[in-house]
Structures are given as structure tokens and as C-alpha cells.
């Protein structure tokens, strides 16, 4: 049944799912995502957005937030929370020019509460702390440099990720071009964004959404283009993945993986993280048709009654993988060929210089938790801006929240490195453990956070570094460690060897059993424990790993082999078993 028919009760393939959720009413009545956002912008009595607009601004790339550190104090003073918005830019493949960077640096300095640029796991940047009077200026500033934030949140296809591989320059360029094409093809066609934020002309006549439908998708939808053997984008965190298959340095097609996703809800066993299923191989010329077919099948078959079960991963488990795949083949007019062979061998960023096959040099900078700000003794934000003033190539934001200074000619390497070192952007002493640890934003800005993540991780990693040293593990040894402040999973903890999921202030669920390459879901080992208890558990487990492991055996693989945790093979069956 098509999403455009708007029945009062949803039925899919003969199964009644229930009455449509209120979010479906909201989208249907929004006049293609316009709502009354323009009227809200004029209301200076409150710093926030009201009623449906609170949800609708997400489709325009923004979340309403407030500073939770001062929420209680403002309440005592009879003030509303310090409402502001976070904006996530649409940057397919994460490539940004020096000119664009200097513009976003200036806006962050002059018009945000926190003055920072936050690189994210969605391979883009976020502004945090933009007050209502500056929101339209923000969109117009971005538009003037060729950037927008259309569909980086909400029930749509979000920012399309692409492996940040500067070495395989020709293959990366081709894959990146497909990431851009997919992003444009699946973008909402409504004129609402231009009308509201860019003072665009209001054109009479109906909007149409041929792929997304008038009710858009049942839930968020995430897409990647990945170049093996590097799984930096974490394919199993995403609804739709195009695995690049190359021959002689040329892209010839994609293996298509569908139905990954990490979000869950505490206490609801109908929700779980899930690996993506391999549908098979397609030639390049069928890429956009297949992307649209997967999206439209999820549009029509996804659960619009229960948002907790609305993502593609649950649709596949409900209707069956083969049934979903057959529908995609029917809609795209193709038959999937057997998948071509590939292997993932890594997913962390290689920090430092590498030389591409095109002779250009690329410097990957480790940005702890993606926060680009001038810290005491480490003026990172100033440093990146100074590099941008002289850099002749581009920047590439990675899905690991780092930044690549890409396309540096040999005669400029020394200048770029000197600028990076003098501003604290290169630290030769940073450990492999710190490089391979990651956290989402969480407090104080994320309204969903249940526990600290970004502010918690640096000192926690220091403790873990001490544990590794205590057990005489080599300096290059590390554990993929991730912290996410709530079970929505932005920090991708559900693909880590050690994953911490926030449960309450100072308390986390401890998950073990993921692997280094991001192809296995970890399982809960201990529930609702403190950071002190977590470190005690890690100390004991690392001690066993150091003394009992096989040659080259990763921590996650060891926990499975040693029987410390059971392997999750089929999430619906195994994750809570």
C-alpha cells in the first residue's frame, strides 16, 4: 500500500500494522515540510519552535536543543530553557573547500554560542548553539558558499557517506561522484527550504515527491558508498550501502547491502541493532534505479504505526529479506547478480601523511571527538583556518570525526605540517587507543542524552591506556572503544569491541564482542554500571586477553572465543538471548 494513500490504518502485504502515528499526521499536514515555520521565526517571545515545527525543522537539517548545564538554573530564574538549534550540513562524501571552511569558521566564531565546528560520524559538520535570530543568516551564509542542510535529519535519506580514501585517488573520485548523485537523486523535491530560509520565490502549483512520497519515509534512512578494504563508514550502521567494486583502478559496479542500523530503545526487546544483508551486485548504470527502489519499498512497507519499529532493518525482518529483495528487483527492473568478492580489513583513519597514486600528499589530522575549537594550549580551530588560507587542495571530513588535508603538492608539505604542529593539530604522542575511540556529542546540547559521552571519553581513554600498559600490551595495540550517550547510537557503539551505551548520568550498559572491522554486533555484558565498575571489568578482561589470546587476535574476537560473551549472528534472535 502506497504511503501516499494516507489510510487511517496501515496494512502491508495483508498484515495490519495499526493506526498511523501522529508523526504521519504531522508530515501529511505540513504542506511539504513548510508547516508554520516562517511564522515561528517571527515570534521573538520564545527562542524555540512550537508544536509541529519542532519536528519539521529536522527535515531542514536542524534540531532544537538547549544548554542542559544551565537548564535548572534558568528554571529557578523563571526563564525558559536557552533554546537554540544545532545544524547538520549536507556534505556528500564529506568534501569541503578551503573557501567554504573559512566561511563556516567565521560563522561559528561570530554567531554560535559555543564557537566550535563539530565533525560528526555522518561525515559532515555541525553548528551548535545557533539562536533563532541567526538561523536564517546561517542558511543564507551556507547557501552563498554552495552548502545546504536539506534532509540531514528527519524521515528522509540523510547525508550520503563515502569512504575517505585519498590514496586510491581515481577510484575515490568515481565513488565520490556516485555519492553526490545518490544524494541529489534521493533529495526531497519540495521548495520549502528555499522559500523559508533563502527567501525564494513562492511558486504556485503543487509540490511532488516522486520517490519519497507526500508523507516522506517512515523513519530516517542512511546511505553510504564504501571502498573496500576500508570500512570507515561502518556499512552495518546504515540502511543502504553501495560497496564499490573496482577493476584496474576503475569502478565497475556495486555490491548492495540493505538493512543495517544501530538504534534501539532501552527496555524494548522489539528494537535491536542489526547488520545489513547482502542483496548482490549491480552495474553502475543501475545505481540510481536501485537506490530509488530500496527507498520506495521502505516508503511503502515500513511501519508507520510504531516509529520504534519503523526503520528498514525491521521491515526486512518483518516481511523477509528475500521478499524485500524481490520487490526491489521488480521496481528497479533488474536481477541482482551474485556479489563480487571483497573484504574489509580496517576502518580507522590512518593518521599522518600518505601519498596518493596521483602524486599528491594527504595529511589526516586526529581531531578528538571531532570538536574543532581553540582549547588552552591547542588552538585547533585557528590552526585549521590558517591551513585553509594557504591550502591548494580540499578538506575531507571522515566518518571517524577526523579531518584530511587532501591534495597537498610536495612543495607545500612542509608549510602545512608546520602550521598543523604549531597549533596542536599533530601530536606524535597520541596513542592508537585514543585514535580508535569515539563518542557522540551527548551533554550539554543533545536533548536525548542520558549520560555523558564526548566530555567523558578523553579521561576514560586515559584510564584504558593505563590498563593496556599495565598488562604489557604493545604500544600499537588497541581496542575499538565507543561511547554513545543514549541508545539511538550516534557514536556507533553497537559496532565496537567495547561499546558503552548511556543509561543514566554516570551509568552505562557495557557491550562486548564486536570486531575490529565492524562486521559484528556486540552484546550486553553488564547493565547499568558506573565508569569505575566498567574499568574494573575492562582491567580483568584485558588481563585475560593479554595472557590467553592467539597471535594477532583482537579483543572482540577473544571475548567470543573465550566464551566471555555469545556471538550475535542474527540480531532478532541473539541480541537479547
From Swiss-Prot:
PROSITE patterns linked: NIR_SIR (PS00365)
What are the required cofactors? siroheme; [4Fe-4S] cluster
Q: Which residues bind [4Fe-4S] cluster?
A: 440, 446, 486, 490
The record's remark on the cofactor is:
Binds 1 siroheme per subunit.
Q: Which reaction does it catalyse?
A: hydrogen sulfide + 3 NADP(+) + 3 H2O = sulfite + 3 NADPH + 4 H(+)
Kindly name one Pfam family recorded for this protein.
NIR_SIR_ferr
**A GO biological process this protein is involved in?**
hydrogen sulfide biosynthetic process
Q: Which UniProt keywords apply?
A: 4Fe-4S, Amino-acid biosynthesis, Cysteine biosynthesis, Heme, Iron, Iron-sulfur, Metal-binding, NADP, Oxidoreductase
Q: In which pathway does it act?
A: Sulfur metabolism; hydrogen sulfide biosynthesis; hydrogen sulfide from sulfite (NADPH route): step 1/1
Q: Quick one: a GO cellular component term?
A: sulfite reductase complex (NADPH)
Example GO molecular function term? sulfite reductase (ferredoxin) activity
What is this enzyme's EC? 1.8.1.2
UniProt binding sites for siroheme:
490
Q: Which SUPFAM superfamilies match?
A: Nitrite and sulphite reductase 4Fe-4S domain-like, Nitrite/Sulfite reductase N-terminal domain-like
Function per UniProt: Component of the sulfite reductase complex that catalyzes the 6-electron reduction of sulfite to sulfide. This is one of several activities required for the biosynthesis of L-cysteine from sulfate.
Record-linked PANTHER family: SULFITE REDUCTASE [NADPH] SUBUNIT BETA (PTHR11493:SF47), SULFITE REDUCTASE [NADPH] SUBUNIT BETA-RELATED (PTHR11493)
Subunit composition and interactions: Alpha(8)-beta(8). The alpha component is a flavoprotein, the beta component is a hemoprotein.
Give the UniProt family note. Answer: Belongs to the nitrite and sulfite reductase 4Fe-4S domain family.
Can you say what this protein is called? Answer: Sulfite reductase [NADPH] hemoprotein beta-component
Q: Which organism is it from?
A: Vibrio cholerae serotype O1 (strain ATCC 39541 / Classical Ogawa 395 / O395)
Phylogenetic placement of the source organism:
Bacteria, Pseudomonadati, Pseudomonadota, Gammaproteobacteria, Vibrionales
Q: Gene name, please?
A: cysI
